[in-house]
């Protein structure tokens, strides 16, 4: 029997006196979910083999055979013809077994100087790095779609809310830009996370390194890593990079969830600020009039799922002594599902943004309720010389009087306004318009249409 593959089938079974039970095989096998790593596993193995040949650890002939075998395996996997075997536990041993069938002893030499511990850590880093790049691109697509929506409605006025109460008038374009800012930070977090992902564990072997004269920097360069992991124990045992990725993903979904909540509220017939295209909605099996915003509702729900995966990974790592433990097999399903959920959500939201129909009249009507320009009246009095706290009190009395009469501030006559402050003059009526209110906030970060358009231009320049 060889160390690589015993007659009992496992790469390690020569040590044991009895076979592993079928129940344990099913319980411990990961192949039916970690086969997703097949391409990056092959990528890592080819880089490792090239280094072994360069260092004269294996022959050039063995290297050529390994390359030939791996090319065939990749073809079989791509064509869906590769036979994944439960008895072989995981993606690594399934590929190694097939390689050995194809090229003989050369395949058995591939694992020289490495362990599955550093092999899988490398695979996961390659996978996460690729998915980060994908997600950053999808965040760009979503931001561009939101910028288009913001540009179309740079002048469309709706009420801004605090505590779900009407606060001040804003523009819909400004509101969309808030989400553009959030998703921009999400992209930055992903890109920053990538720096810590992009370090090579391969060469750490099981936990202590290897006795072979390997060249880790060569492998790192081949695979596009910025550096190698500088401690072999740390390289194989920690999954903090995956946790960090999932934390950044959870924040993406949190921002998606906040946006979803608003879309659901805005689409409600009681509010009626927007409509969402039929292709993103469903109906009811009993109520024929219903049009349900299922996509934002489901995204809101899936956020809890992604948050749960983050907690699962944190809990997975918290009690493990160094170095590698079988616990870490449980890192993949939460990680994979996080990737799938975030990728699918970002794709559909970028598409859905093009299917949002804004209803400016409904938004404007809502902004005319709730005394949204009260702060503008207070600011007006301050500019006339009244201390802000006194201005605040005077306007509060005016609002109270309007509430009692069921009218808006702009419905008061000049004489009625002057009862609250003699500083009020005829120019107040221009201040109390919705357009005047938003136009007055003409500074960087403000809701004035001019600033909204400038912010859109800045974001477009960054995304170009």
Swiss-Prot record:
InterPro entries xrefs: Arg_succ_lyase_C, Argininosuccinate_lyase, Fumarase/histidase_N, Fumarate_lyase_CS, Fumarate_lyase_fam, Fumarate_lyase_N, L-Aspartase-like
Keywords of the record: Amino-acid biosynthesis, Arginine biosynthesis, Cytoplasm, Lyase
Main location: cytoplasm
Subcellular location: Cytoplasm
GO BP terms, alphabetized: arginine biosynthetic process via ornithine; L-arginine biosynthetic process
Entry EC number(s): 4.3.2.1
Cleaved signal peptide residues: none
GO cellular component, one term: cytosol
GO molecular function, one term: argininosuccinate lyase activity
Reactions this protein catalyses: 2-(N(omega)-L-arginino)succinate = fumarate + L-arginine
Family: Belongs to the lyase 1 family. Argininosuccinate lyase subfamily.
Name of the protein in its database record: Argininosuccinate lyase
